[in-house]
């Protein structure tokens, strides 16, 4: 099975940061190019443009040649997957199994936006990962080197994603690695019912009469603090006629809140899983 480790990319130099922004912008441009080709083919011929034909059209484009070939192909495959889902829903709609009104073509990414960099073929140099470049890009840019977290030292990494966050003010990196699934012979007659709430995030009761609570007040206070600080920053922004864009301070605040919520929810889920394993709940 596959698991994922997600981290925030830190300790980037100014040049490395700008390179990642530039590559993510190029990835967005290639994504929109790929979407355009499939959409236009559908409008003109009422047919699906497969990945192979889209690749043949775009492999000589400027955006494709600026990216490493593996990364560029991953982008085209992502677009291909989106359109396969659309045409799959369209087929169901023609059979009367899905409403036509819910079938929507994949949309373009924002013109000033960024897209995720996907590395599907990972090569490591010890505990370091060097972001792959195209031959043309490598001539004029220094390499971006990322240290792999120690927890992945003995793992087989299958894919790496670099995700721009908050208008590419910072980046997250996701490592997808392969492990053998643990086979547990738990009792299928033992069950656990979970009720989600606010002050009590989870109220869990087993069919053997045992129960436990997971506190939700900490999560509630995190959101209350965020709303209070964000309202203050929004008030200042409105007085300065800053517009609808998120400010740097708001982006930092949102990132902190999201990290705290993600950490708390992950630990709560881990506690439930551990309880089920210890009590033979299958």
Task: Give the residues covered by each predicted segment.
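Nucleic-acid substrate recognition interfaces
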Residues: 1-282
């Amino acid at each position: 099975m596959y698991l994922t480790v997600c981290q925030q990319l830190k300790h980037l130099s100014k040049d490395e940061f700008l390179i990642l922004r530039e590559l993510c912008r190029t990835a967005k441009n290639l994504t929109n190019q790929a979407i355009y080709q499939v959409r236009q083919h559908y409008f003109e011929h009422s047919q699906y443009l497969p990945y192979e034909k889209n690749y043949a059209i775009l492999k000589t484009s400027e955006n494709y040649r600026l990216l490493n070939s593996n990364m560029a192909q991953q982008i085209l495959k992502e677009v291909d997957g989106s359109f396969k889902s659309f045409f799959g829903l369209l087929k169901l709609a023609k059979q009367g199994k899905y409403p036509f009104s819910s079938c929507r073509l994949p949309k373009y990414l924002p013109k000033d936006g960024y897209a995720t960099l996907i590395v599907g073929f990972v090569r490591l140099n010890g505990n370091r990962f060097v972001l792959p470049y195209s031959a043309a890009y490598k001539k004029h840019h220094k390499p971006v080197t990322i240290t792999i977290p120690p927890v992945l030292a003995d793992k087989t990494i299958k894919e790496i994603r670099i995700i721009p966050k908050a208008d590419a003010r910072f980046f997250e990196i996701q490592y997808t690695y392969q492990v053998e699934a643990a086979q547990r012979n738990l009792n299928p007659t033992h069950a656990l019912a979970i009720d989600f709430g606010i002050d009590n995030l989870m109220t869990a009761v087993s069919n053997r009469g045992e129960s436990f609570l997971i506190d939700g007040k900490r999560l509630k206070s995190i959101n209350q603090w965020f709303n209070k600080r964000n309202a203050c920053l929004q008030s200042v922004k409105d007085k300065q006629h800053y517009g609808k864009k998120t400010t740097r301070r708001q982006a930092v605040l949102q990132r902190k809140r999201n990290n705290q919520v993600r950490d708390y929810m992950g630990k709560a889920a881990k506690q439930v899983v551990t309880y089920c394993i210890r009590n033979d709940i299958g």
